[in-house]
């Protein structure tokens, strides 16, 4: 899929011309954009050389800007700042993907598993509904320890 530039006309199936504001980017577009930015040969000279260490300060900065937008009840700015934090998450995931460790899909899967596991009243079977938060956390800790000891 080609990524369109802002202001660039988009042609839908059947050759119908659409204004760019009528079409929204998707999460998959964001993944492709990050891959293109990080490409070592043809990517962005700045984005392609960033590391976890070099990006740490930006993650802190962007999280601070999210908090500021919340404090100011500035929903328009909050939307933009959450996008900046999402970019930070995505670039860290892209770095890990390049190293063969994990992808954004692994991160999404992990948080979904955690939320389902921590809310047995909503997602669990009848037997699981009586688990306390403390019991769930204890089981998670045991599972992490078991994975580390493999």
Enumerate the language-model features and the residues they cover.
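Flexible "arm" and connector segments at domain edges
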Residues: 18-81, 87-150
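Polybasic, lysine-rich low-complexity intrinsically disordered segments
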Residues: 9-10
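Short intrinsically disordered terminal tails
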Residues: 14-15
């Amino acid at each position: 899929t080609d990524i369109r530039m802002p202001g660039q006309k988009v042609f839908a199936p059947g050759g119908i011309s659409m204004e760019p504001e009528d079409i929204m980017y998707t999460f998959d577009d964001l993944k492709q954009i990050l891959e293109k930015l990080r490409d070592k040969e043809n990517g962005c000279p700045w984005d392609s050389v960033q590391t976890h260490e070099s990006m740490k300060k930006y993650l802190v900065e962007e999280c601070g800007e999210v908090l500021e937008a919340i404090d100011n009840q500035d929903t328009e700015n909050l939307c933009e700042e959450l996008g900046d934090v999402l970019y930070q998450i995505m670039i860290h995931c892209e770095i890990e993907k390049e190293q063969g460790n994990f992808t954004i899909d692994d991160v999404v899967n992990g948080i979904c598993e955690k939320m389902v596991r921590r809310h047995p009243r909503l997602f669990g079977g009848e037997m699981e509904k009586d688990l306390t938060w403390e019991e769930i956390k204890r089981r998670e800790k045991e599972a992490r320890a078991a994975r580390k000891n493999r």
